Design a protein with these regions (language model features):
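Active-site bordering "gate/hinge" segments
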Residues: 1-264
Length: 264
């Protein structure tokens, strides 16, 4: 649950009194005491490009006994701000909910708006949305693979994937001028079109990106000293995946045949 902000409905997951101030770093964290047991606190401000979060590890050597995650630093009261809309600012608020998923959030909002209005985006508009969604998905997954490599201290793949993620973001900028896809998806369709010359350039960049990504990622899986650090770490049972409603690679890794692109 969000530790540092009440929801706009005032139902506090931590059951704190309404008149109690909520301040970052004020609260009880789980602790493990013992000889050579140490605590590692990370965040909420990180050196990379990830959004803020506080992670507190209780460790013994390389064994992690307990991890507590405190989120909520990015909560800005947007749900409450959206009440009474839509208006001219609504789509811009939706696009800035999270930097990694501007296109996905904008598409979800537009699909809801179109369904309520009884209309649909044009076939070309839907195709351009689909391209932008796939580019956003690629950037996220490539970035995550690089981050995983960094987590096990395998810097070659971490560095390569960071650069390749930037190449994918630049492809999105080729479509609409924004590396995060802002301004592209709009109710009823899209805000930008793409001619044949631009699509040919996009295809050329995609081919180059695929080759680079395969080399960078296969390099990680061919390095036994890196692979061994992933073994038996973070495995999620299928039943838990169903209970949590996991989707995407996290769901498919547990054996669930889920793909929102196919299922919607």
């Amino acid at each position: 649950p969000v530790r540092y902000r009440r929801s706009w409905t005032d139902r506090d997951a931590w059951q704190r009194p309404a008149d109690e101030a909520i301040l970052p770093a004020v609260g009880d964290f789980y602790r493990v005491d013992g000889e050579q047991v140490h605590e590692v606190a990370v965040g909420p401000v990180h050196a990379g490009v990830i959004e803020p979060g506080h992670f507190r590890f209780q460790c013994y050597g390389e064994t992690v006994f307990h991890l507590e995650i405190a989120l909520g630093y990015q909560h800005r009261g947007i749900e409450e701000t959206l009440l009474g809309g839509p208006d001219a600012r609504t789509i811009h608020l939706i696009e800035t909910l999270a930097g990694d998923t501007s296109v996905a959030h904008a598409t979800a909002y537009c699909q809801v708006s179109e369904a309520l209005a009884g209309c649909a985006a044009t076939a070309r508009g839907q195709a351009l949305r689909g391209i932008a969604l796939e580019l956003e998905r690629m950037a996220t997954h490539i970035g995550d693979l690089g981050a995983l490599a960094g987590d096990v201290a395998y810097l070659p793949t971490a560095s390569f994937c960071g650069r390749i993620r930037g190449d994918v973001l630049n492809m999105t900028a080729l479509l609409c001028g924004s590396r995060f896809g802002r301004g592209l998806v709009r109710p009823g369709g899209v805000g930008f079109d793409a001619n044949a010359e631009r699509m040919a350039e996009l295809r050329r960049r995609l081919d180059a990106c695929e080759k680079d990504a395969r080399v960078a990622i296969e390099l990680l899986w061919r390095t036994s000293s890196a692979v061994v650090r992933f073994e038996e770490v973070g495995a999620v049972p299928r039943a838990i995946a169903v209970e949590l409603g996991l989707v995407g690679p996290a769901a498919r890794a547990t054996g669930l045949a889920r793909d929102i692109r196919r299922d919607q």
